[in-house]
Structure formats: C-alpha cells, structure tokens
UniProtKB/Swiss-Prot annotation:
Keywords of the record: Coiled coil, Phosphoprotein
Expression tissues: Isoform 2 is expressed at higher levels in kidney and brain than in liver, lung, testis and heart. Within the brain, isoform 2 is highly expressed in the granular layer of the cerebellum, the cortex and the hippocampus. In embryos, isoform 2 is expressed in the epithelium of the developing intestine, stomach, olfactory epithelium, neuronal layers of the retina, salivary gland, kidney and dorsal root ganglion.
Listed GO CC annotations: cytoplasm; endoplasmic reticulum; glutamatergic synapse; perinuclear region of cytoplasm; synapse
Organism, scientific name: Mus musculus
Name of the featured protein: Tumor protein D52
Length: 224
C-alpha cells in the first residue's frame, strides 16, 4: 500500500506553476489580482484592475501622484527656488511682526484702546452696510410697507366712524332715542330742546335710582 502511494506521488504533477502564478492549461492565477494573462492587450484595462495599497507610514498622496522623472539640473533648480521662497516667507513674517509692533506703539501713544477700536470698527461696518444697495432697497421696501399700513389704519378708522354715524342716523337708533326721551319726560320732566343723548341716559339713570330709594306713601303715613 505504501509503495503504491509513493508511485502515485511521484507520477502526480500539479497543473499550476506556483513560481510564476500561471496556469498553463486552463486557469491563470496572479498574486497582483489582474485577471488577464501576460501579454494580453487587455492586461492593463478593466474594472478589476487593482492599485497598490500604501503601506503603513507611507504617504498615500505621494503614491497617487508620483513625481515626474527630473534630471539632476532640474532638481537642483527646484531646490534653489524652494529655498528662495522659504527665505521670502520668513522675511515677510519678520516685516509683518515689526509692522504690528509699530502699530501697537502708535495706538498706545494716541490713547486708542481696544474698546474704542472695536466701536470704530462697528461704526464703520454699519456705515458700509447702510451704503450697500441691498440695505437701501430693504429700507425703501419697509418704508413703503409702513406707509401702506398707516393708510390702512386710517381707512379703518374712517370706516368705523362712518359706520357709527350711519348707526346713529338709522331709524332703529332714532326710535330707541325717542323712547328714552319719553321715559325721561315721564320720570323727570320734559327734556329741554337740544339736549344730548348722553345727558338723557344720565338723567334717566338718576331718576330711576331716586324712585327706588324713596319709601312708599303708605309707609310714610303709618310712621308716627
């Protein structure tokens, strides 16, 4: 049995070439993930093409945008330009710091505090806002709206006044006024000509209260 197993093991040959990752018979295996065999015109084309993954600590941006091949002269020129730009940035930073220091000294001598400067900035900012076309249009719109609202309120007041006059001149109101006048004439005497309706109501109320407070005649005769 062991001899037979040894013979099968010696005769067996794997269909895969594990050194190159190529199945010469029917299947292509590649550690890079590309499904096209070597030499195929579609080897670098397709949806399954994979990109190399950045290792830990490796700059992925540098991998994605690999630098172009530069000559030594070009690299040296770029280095000189880089050094020059860095020196210019440092010089500008020093100049800016000196200017800011000089500005603070001038403000101190003029007595300009941070609060005053803040107020000036607020005032200037508001002035700039009021000078814009958007603010002017908004202000005009609000002004027109206010005028329309005032006109509407005036119209409402006029309508209410007219309605009250119409009610006062209506036959129903006049009939009620005549009844009140008749009641007053019966209770407190005749109403003088030209009397006010408010006076009529007050007189009627006073006469009614007087009648309710006076004792009946029978009680007055029985009392000693």
């Amino acid at each position: 049995m062991e001899c037979r197993d040894m013979e099968l093991a010696d005769d067996y040959q794997s269909p895969f070439d594990f050194d190159s990752g190529v199945n010469k018979n029917y299947l292509y295996l590649s550690p890079s993930g590309n499904t096209s065999p070597p030499g195929s015109p579609t080897q670098n084309v397709g949806l399954l093409k994979t990109e190399p993954v950045a290792e830990e600590g490796e700059d992925a941006v540098t991998m994605l945008s690999a630098p172009e091949a530069l000559t030594e002269e070009e690299q040296e020129e770029l280095r000189r330009e880089l050094t020059k730009v860095e020196e210019e940035i440092q010089t500008l930073s020093q100049v800016l710091a000196a200017k800011e220091k000089h500005l603070a000294e001038l403000k101190r001598k003029l007595g300009i505090s941070s609060l005053q400067e803040f107020k000036q900035n607020i005032a200037k900012g508001w002035q700039d806002v009021t000078a814009t076309n958007a603010y002017k249009k908004t202000s005009e719109t609000l002004s027109q709206a206010g005028q329309k609202a005032s006109a509407a309120f005036s119209s409402v007041g006029s309508v209410i006044t007219k309605k009250l006059e119409d009610v006062k001149n209506s036959p129903t109101f006049k009939s009620f006024e005549e009844k009140v006048e008749n009641l007053k004439s019966k209770v407190g005497g005749a109403k003088p000509a030209g009397g006010d309706f408010g006076e009529v109501l007050n007189s009627t109320a006073n006469a009614t209260s007087t009648m309710t407070t006076e004792p009946p005649p029978e009680q007055m005769t029985e009392s000693p």
